[in-house]
Curated annotation (Swiss-Prot):
Disruption-associated phenotype: Early lethality in both males and females.
Family affiliation: Belongs to the CWC22 family.
Boundaries of every MI domain copy: 776-892
GO cellular component, one term: nuclear speck
Signal peptide: none
Biased composition range(s): Basic and acidic residues: 22-37, 58-79, 154-182, 246-258, 292-311, 358-380, 388-423, 1145-1218, 1230-1292
Function: Required for pre-mRNA splicing and for exon-junction complex (EJC) assembly. Hinders eIF4AIII from non-specifically binding RNA and escorts it to the splicing machinery to promote EJC assembly on mature mRNAs.
Primary localization class, coarse: nucleus
Positions with biased composition (Acidic residues): 743-756
The name this protein goes by in its record: Pre-mRNA-splicing factor CWC22 homolog
Compositionally biased intervals (Basic residues): 264-291, 312-357, 1040-1083, 1118-1135
Length: 1292
């Protein structure tokens, strides 16, 4: 019985092992790619553990079989064993091909409890594996046999120890046998149920050794053909195969022991001691392997035609072989060490539990595997189907694209023609055909939200394309423009520009966009609650003209407040209630609405509601006390009760106390309306009596675009309405009010503007002369300049301001003003102005105009500002930022310049010389292009102006610039003074008569000389024609005198020589008398009064001039006489000439002394006048005296030169006449006389020239001395005067 039971157990265990093998294979096949690494590690560990267990189990089973054979040997058992060995040899190949997988399954705790004859089946399997050339299996068997079977070489001591351990093992085996019998019965019932369902096939036949795939298929067929009636025979065959395997194992073990190392032999006793635990593990191993084999046969039968699974199995088997080869024999100890602590009972119970679970779930596993295979096939089919559908879709898309392209190419020309015809087709007409381009614009513009963002350039293009104002696209563009303009104006509004913003808003069509206006105002107020009073004032102005807009905004605010109150949104409640409070202050809303809101907030008090009520009271408390004192009194009583109850937070209670204090102060810090925002009169305002319950609909439809069929008519109506409201201002913005009008509308609006511009403004128009925009511009420029680090950054910021045309000059004025305000000149401003002139030429002309205006108004600038301004313009000039032609406004003379302008010119040219250098500046000023512009700076029209210019530039240290002027002044023709009319009227007089009558007529000549001097001053600027006429008249008079003299000389030659000597003596006496008289007159003049000083000086000058003339004429005559008598009396001549020279020198010294005394006297007189008049008229007197002093030497020089020229002319004419007369009288016989005359003429000429040169030299020396003395005195006077001025300024 025990044998049959063991055979049944082995069969069931083999079936169960086949099932488990199939499960593990299916799982590993489906998850092959994922769990390759895991299966390798687990299979290695499990093989190590199971090898040790199998060796112990084989030893136990061999002992049991020997006992059973000795008890019940029979023929039937032998036959059954033979059959079983044959069948097992065939089936072992299939089961052993999956040995690696069975080992992994057994390691997870799925170990069967069947014991008995599983070791025999393992031996048979090992033989078949050896035949089928499976090296991994052979290595496992060799390891087992080496561990279990003791070789001949082992010592007797070790054998005796093994014999002592056998009875202990037998006791354990008896208990195991009992437990296995129970489990075997259960496995037999399960196996019978499974075998009934299997098909009966032919009995198994031995097959030749082939590849693993073929062996496994045949084994599956043979295992499926088994029947329950032959199980006993199989068990007998298995027992026989066990015996054979044991013998062969002994021989192999001995053989391997011979080959093995001595270390293994030493370890064998320790292994034999641990055999019981190994036997248990080997039993579980055999059972699990049989179960895996059965399951794998079923799975292979279902998926026999799948080639992919075969390839996977081949790769798996090869990997398992490689792993088994790589294992070392020494690793079998590790699982033993791990499981030393486990008791045999515990391990048995665990194996039983796993076996029960496995047996119950075998059917479920089979079903699951079948479902899994079906699902895999289903997925494959679905994948194929999806790929096919995708390919079809792509083909259809390609075909559609080709069709669309062909359609487009065919109909492009047709669409182009239809565009022109249907361009103005409106969207309202459903029958109208519109183009693709128009459809796109309509799609973008007619959506509710406005569609995507359209850039301004594209929007203008779209607007230009749409020519029909009644179309939806055009109205949509106008709507978007209206929305942007309203939103922009609302964001710009403040206390200062509220009037301007209101006018601009009224120019827009706010009746059409009233929803947009109310929404933007509410949004702006919520974003900036501090400007609530400004928005309320704006609403009040609009409400006075359009009450429906004010009512709509008030409705929306009340609805917003109610919603926020229901939602407990404190921030929205605060903002909306604050706006309503200011609307109550502006009389847009009635006070009943405010009282209703307060009662709503206070009747059910919470911390938030009371806080909102207090904020509301602060804003409109003053107005409510004026309008309804009882109502606000009731509100404050309710607040007092809330405060006494003390249920609220301490913070809120403190706020209530603060409100009572504010009320006590009369809301002085919370005024209802400030003065600058009281823009609407009380009679013009429209107050809305709106209650909390009345506000129901916010009319949000007005916020969205709506097509208007009468768009043009409504726009014209609103234009007329805005003109009535605004007056003439509305006509200025007709073109921009629509903000979406095309070129036709703009041209018509401009025509209207022109017609209305001709009309005179009405009396009610307001003209803003405060120049607020100009002030704001100057403020921004000033702040930008002061906030910049360098001039480049400042220029960049100012260029980004985008100034309007005409504002460039304001920018230039700001540059100059900022520069003038500095304590010292900063180059920053010059560089900034230069940069603007270089960037844009439009700034050059404003700077040139500012230069001219500044030069004309230099007297208004103080010294510091004058210095900075002149240096600023010097920088612009030397950098050529502005033209040098601006210097034509400067006229450098005494009359056209002031002290401020001279200082301006001085600093300007000194700065230019510092920047450019004197040579470069001189070169620039000599440029022919600038000659006309610099004519005022370097005047050549009048010597007086020329000298002033030379003296000015010399005084400022730039005399090198006046070299050309100095040269011009030297080479210029000197003006000849006009000759007195009395002198011209007189007849020519003899020399003797003129000399005798000179003393008697001294007074008359002095007066005539003074008159001639005055006339010469007045006629200094006369024309050249007058001077030429005067000179011609003088030459005629000289000719007449010369003729008379020639006649007299002829007569005198015939007269006696005695008369000549008498005349000469009489002349000398007369000259001495004249000199004495002159001395007396000069002494008298020094003691005379101040009024007669001028006349006496002029008379002395005239006398000196006349005396010099008479002396020169007398000297000439005396020289002639002495020369004629030189042969006879040479000593007299030399004495006379010496005496005359001494007398002349004395006369000159006397004149200088007298002049010096006159000058001193005049200076004293001027100082006295200056002290009397307070220094006012001193400049004028000095100027006049200086003029006279300058003109006196000029007159002298001119007169002396004129007289010399006249003398030379007379001598020449006389000599010519004399030579002619002599030639006529004597003819050719008077050659000797002619030679004598020529020699005499030459000697006379030499004498004359010598005398003239000596006189000239003496005169020049005297003149230079007097001039240097005058200059020194002048400097001393100026220095003393400057001291007086400085001291007076310092004293105040």
């Amino acid at each position: 019985m025990t044998g049959s039971q063991s055979e049944n157990n082995t069969s069931t265990s083999s079936n169960s092992s086949e099932d488990t093998n199939n499960d593990s294979r299916n799982e590993s096949e489906t998850n092959a790619d994922k769990n390759v690494v895991e299966t390798k590690t687990t299979s290695d560990n499990n093989n190590k553990m199971m090898n040790a267990a199998e060796t112990a189990a084989n030893e136990e089973k061999n002992g049991r079989q020997k006992k059973e054979k000795s008890k019940t040997p029979s023929k039937e058992d032998k036959k059954s064993r033979k059959k079983k060995s044959e069948s097992s040899s065939e089936s072992s190949s299939s089961s052993d091909s999956d040995s690696s997988e069975s080992s992994s399954s057994s390691s997870d705790g799925e170990v069967s409890t069947s014991s008995g004859s599983s070791s025999d089946s393992e031996k048979v399997k090992s033989k078949v594996k050896n035949k089928s050339k499976s090296p991994s299996a052979q290595r496992e068997v060799v390891q087992k046999e080496t561990v279990t079977d003791t070789p001949d070489n082992i010592s007797k001591e070790t054998q005796e120890k093994l014999v002592e351990d056998i009875p202990k093992e037998n006791e354990l085996n008896v208990n195991l046998a009992k437990e296995d019998s129970v489990n075997a019965k259960q496995n037999d019932t399960e196996a019978s149920n499974e075998n009934v369902a299997e098909e009966i096939t032919k009995p198994p036949q031995k097959q030749p050794d082939t590849e693993e795939g073929e062996i496994t298929e045949n084994n599956e067929k043979n295992s499926s053909a088994r029947s329950p009636s032959k199980e006993k025979q199989l068990s007998a065959n298995r027992s026989r195969s066990r015996e054979r395997r044991s013998h062969s194992g002994d021989s192999r073990g001995a053989h391997s022991g011979d080959k093995g190392s001595p270390s293994r032999l030493k370890r064998s006793p320790s292994r034999s001691k641990k055999s019981p635990s190994r036997s248990k593990r080997s039993v579980s191993r055999n059972r699990s392997s049989s179960r895996h084999g059965r399951d794998s046969s079923r799975n292979r039968r279902s998926v026999s035609g799948d080639k992919e699974n075969q390839l996977r199995r081949k790769s798996r088997s090869r990997s398992s072989r490689s792993r088994s080869r790589s294992r070392s024999r020494s690793r079998s100890r590790r699982p033993e060490r791990k499981h030393r602590s486990r008791t045999p009972r515990r391990s048995r119970s665990r194996e039983r539990r796993h076996e029960r679970r496995r047996s119950v779930s075998s059917d479920y596993d089979a079903r699951r595997r079948s479902r899994r295979s079906e699902s895999i096939e289903r997925r494959r089919e679905e994948r194929k189907r999806r790929h096919a559908e995708r390919d079809e879709r792509e083909k259809s898309k390609r075909s559609r694209r080709d069709e669309d392209d062909s359609f487009k190419t065919n109909k492009v020309s047709a669409e182009m023609e239809k565009d022109k015809e249907n361009d103005n087709a409106t969207v309202t007409d459903p029958k109208a055909k519109i183009t693709e381009r128009q459809r796109k614009t309509v799609d973008i513009l007619t959506s509710r939200t406005g569609g995507a963002y359209i850039p301004p350039a594209k929007l203008r293009m779209m607007q230009a394309e749409i020519t029909d104002k009644a179309s939806a696209a055009y109205q949509r563009i106008a709507w978007e423009a209206l929305k942007k303009s309203i939103h922009g104006y609302i964001n710009k509004v403040n206390v200062d520009n509220i009037a301007i913003i209101t006018r601009e808003l009224l120019k827009e069509n706010i009746v059409r966009g009233r929803g947009l206006l109310c929404r933007s105002i509410i949004q702006a107020q919520a974003a900036s609650p501090t400007f609530t009073h400004v928005y309320a004032a704006l609403v009040a102005i609009i409400n006075s003209k359009f009450p429906n807009i004010g009512e709509l905004l008030l409705k929306r605010l009340v609805i917003q407040f109610k919603r926020a109150f229901r939602r407990n949104d404190k921030t929205v409640c605060l903002s909306s209630s604050r706006f309503i409070a200011h609307l109550v202050n502006q009389r847009v809303a009635h006070e009943i609405l405010a009282l209703e809101i307060l009662t709503l907030l206070v009747e059910s008090p919470t911390d938030d509601s009371v806080e909102v009520a207090i904020a509301f009271l602060k804003e409109c408390g003053m107005k409510l006390t004026e309008v309804s004192s009882k109502g606000i009194g009731a509100i404050f009583e309710m607040l007092k009760n809330i405060l006494h109850e003390g249920k609220l937070d301490k913070r809120v209670q403190y706020m209530i106390e603060v409100v009572f204090q504010v009320r006590k102060d009369g809301f002085k810090d919370h005024q209802s309306v400030i003065e600058s925002l009281e823009l609407v009169e009380e009679d013009d305002q429209f107050t809305h009596l709106l209650m909390l319950d009345d506000a129901t609909s916010p009319e949000d439809v007005l916020n969205a675009f709506k097509f208007d069929e009468q768009y043009e008519a409504n726009e014209e109506k609103y234009k007329g309405l805005s003109k009535e409201i605004l007056g003439s201002d509305a006509s200025d913005s007709d073109g921009s009010s629509g903000s979406g009008s095309d070129s036709d509308s703009e041209s018509s609006d401009s025509d209207e503007d022109k017609n209305e511009g001709d009309e005179k403004p009405t009396a009610g128009d307001i003209i803003d002369n405060t120049e607020t925009n100009l002030i704001a511009l100057r403020r921004t420029i000033y702040l930008t300049i002061n906030s910049s680090l360098d001039y480049e950054e400042c220029a960049h910021k100012l260029m980004k301001m985008q100034l309007k045309p005409g504002q460039e000059i304001e920018l230039c004025h700001m540059f100059l003003d900022c520069c003038a305000e500095q304590r010292t000149y900063e180059k920053f401003y010059g560089l900034l102005a230069q940069r603007f002139c270089n960037i844009n030429k439009s700034y050059i002309e404003p700077f040139e105009e500012i230069f001219k205006d500044t030069y004309q108004t230099t007297h208004r600038l103080d010294t510091n500002r004058l210095r900075n301004v002149s240096k600023f313009f010097a920088h612009l000039l030397f950098t050529d930022a502005i033209s040098w032609d601006v210097l034509d406004c400067i006229k450098l003379n005494e009359d056209d310049t002031t002290s401020s302008s001279r200082i301006f010119i001085k600093i300007l040219f000194q700065e230019l010389a510092e920047y450019m250098g004197l040579g470069q500046l001189n070169k620039k000023l000599k440029d022919e292009v600038l000659a006309e512009s610099l004519a005022g700076l370097f005047p050549k029209d009048n010597p007086r102006n020329t000298r002033f210019s030379i003296n000015f530039f010399t005084s400022i240290g730039l005399g090198g610039l006046t070299d050309e002027l100095r040269q011009f002044l030297k080479n210029a023709p000197k003006s000849v003074p006009a000759i007195n009319a009395e002198i011209l009227a007189n007849k020519p007089v003899d020399v003797s008569n003129s000399s005798s009558s000179s003393s008697s007529s001294s007074s008359s000549t002095s007066s005539s000389s003074s008159s001639s001097s005055s006339s010469s001053e007045s006629s200094a600027s006369s024309s050249s024609s007058d001077s030429s006429s005067d000179s011609s008249s003088d030459s005629e008079v000289d000719k007449k005198k010369r003729k008379g003299k020639v006649k007299k000389t002829k007569k005198k030659k015939t007269s006696n020589k005695k008369e000549k000597t008498k005349k000469s003596k009489s002349k000398n006496k007369k000259d001495a008398k004249k000199k004495a008289k002159k001395r007396k007159s000069k002494k008298g003049s020094t003691s005379s009064e101040d009024d007669s000083s001028k006349s006496e000086s002029s008379s002395s000058e005239s006398k000196s001039s006349d005396s010099s003339d008479s002396e020169q004429s007398g000297n000439d005559k005396s020289k002639k006489k002495t020369k004629s008598k030189s042969k006879t009396k040479p000593n007299k001549k030399s004495k006379r000439s010496d005496s005359e020279d001494v007398e002349n020198e004395r006369d000159i010294k006397r004149k200088k002394r007298e002049d010096f005394g006159n000058y001193i006297h005049e200076d004293r007189r001027r100082d006295e006048e200056y002290s009397k008049n307070g220094g006012r008229d001193r400049k004028k007197d000095n100027h006049g005296n200086n003029k006279e002093k300058r003109e006196i030497p000029q007159r002298r020089d001119s007169e002396i030169e004129r007289r010399r020229e006249e003398r030379e002319k007379r001598h020449r004419e006389r000599e010519r006449n004399f030579s002619r007369s002599r030639s006529r009288s004597r003819g050719g016989s008077g050659r000797k006389d002619r030679d004598r005359r020529e020699t005499n003429g030459r000697s006379e000429r030499k004498d004359r020239e010598r005398d003239r040169d000596s006189d000239h030299r003496r005169y020049r020396k005297d003149y230079d001395r007097s001039r240097s003395r005058d200059r020194n005195e002048k400097r001393e006077r100026e220095y003393s005067r400057s001291k007086l001025r400085n001291t007076s300024k310092e004293r105040g």
